[in-house]
Amino acid sequence: MDIIANLLNGTLVFSTALIFAALGGLISERSGIINIGIEGFMVSGAFFSAVTAYYAEAAGFGAFSPWLGLIGAFLFSVIFSSIHAVACIKYGANQVVSGTVINILASGSTFYLVKMIFAGSAETPILTNVFHKVNIPYLTDIPFVGKVIFNAYPTTYVAIALIIVFHLILFRTPSGLRLRSVGEHPNAAATVGVKVNRTR
């Protein structure tokens, strides 16, 4: 039983990045934009997260370094996604082609940058300050479920919370309704005054 619990816990922990990416893809798809550049966003986000955390650690931020790395991943993923958004929404580029270009650009540019920044090394140095698993008191003691869900990294808990938040925003708020309307019926949404391109 412990083996299964550990296996499921590991699956949950390592799927955290995929959950973040999937939520971003969900918003994009719901707004009517095909986004196959998610892999590129993940690659660029992972790279800039590691670089930001490395320099933050070198600057003496200590335990805050991984959190700053997480913010760095978010910011640079926003930059890459903005390229995709401008190309598809403003200039009407083919969404599949744009996403493919983002994937290629992210893979190539990050590989080049890591070699340039770290003197020819193909990877970033190992960080001292990293996220550690957090045990939630009492809940961790629940048989099986406690080991699976309540023994994870802070980012895993954030990802699970965001699933609930995104669901509520999409299906329980006017903003979510507008977002879904521009994806499903953009002409009808425009007729009632929703700014389709701005929403996307």
Predicted regions and their residues:
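Membrane-interfacial amphipathic/re-entrant helices at transmembrane-helix boundaries
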Residues: 1-21, 34, 48, 57-68
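Hydrophobic alpha-helical transmembrane segments
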Residues: 7-11, 40, 44, 67-75, ...
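Hydrophobic core segments of alpha-helical transmembrane domains in multi-pass membrane transport
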Residues: 21-22, 46-50, 107-111, 156-169
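Short, non-helical or kinked segments that cap or interrupt transmembrane helices
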Residues: 26-48, 89-102, 178
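Membrane-interface helix caps of multi-pass small-molecule transporters
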Residues: 26-27, 51, 55, 79-82, ...
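Alpha-helical transmembrane segments within multi-pass membrane transporters and channels
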Residues: 61-107
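Extracellular/periplasmic helix-loop junction at the C-terminal end of a transmembrane helix
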Residues: 107-145
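Helix-loop-helix "hairpin" substructures at the membrane interface of multi-pass membrane proteins
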Residues: 148-200
